[in-house]
Amino acid sequence: KNAEFVAFAQSIADAAVANNVKSAEELNEVLINGAKVSDMINDKLASIGEKIGVAKFERIEAAYVASYIHGANRMGVLVGLNKEAAEVGKDVAMQIAAMNPLAVDANSIPADTIERERAIIIDTMKEDPKMAGKPDEMVAKIAEGKLNAFFKENTLLAQAFVKDGGITVEAYLKSAGDVVVTEFKRVALG
């Protein structure tokens, strides 16, 4: 990943933005200085002898999009915000890189994921000898508490803010002028 390769990758990323590309397939057809991106990638492959390509393509549309690249270009995060807030966007993107939330909030987690987690919790509780003989209502209440703990750990807004563990990300966003995260994307190599 020398400077030449990084510049090559950046030129492709710039072309994706400039051409409002929405998919990897569409990106392969974009022209840069008269050459298709797919042909440029094949030429680069021939010169470096390693298979390269655009394996994943993410795009966010928001009033403001912040980005963060972590770990020698091995992970990237995009965060859509309701307004321009560069420092807040970078802080939130770093949070996402570090804590890998599943969604912005509990309402954004797919129903099948919630049901799968609920089933795991209930199955685990059924196998727990301490739960034997407990009323179903009590088991259901405990399961909901465990599900809420799952949301706290796995949703961005409910997570403890990594730069100040005394507040949640949601509280940080409010204190920064009611900044709202509209969506995020986290992509890691490997």
Language model: regions and residue ranges:
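N-terminal assembly/interaction segments in proteins that build large macromolecular machines
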Residues: 1-190
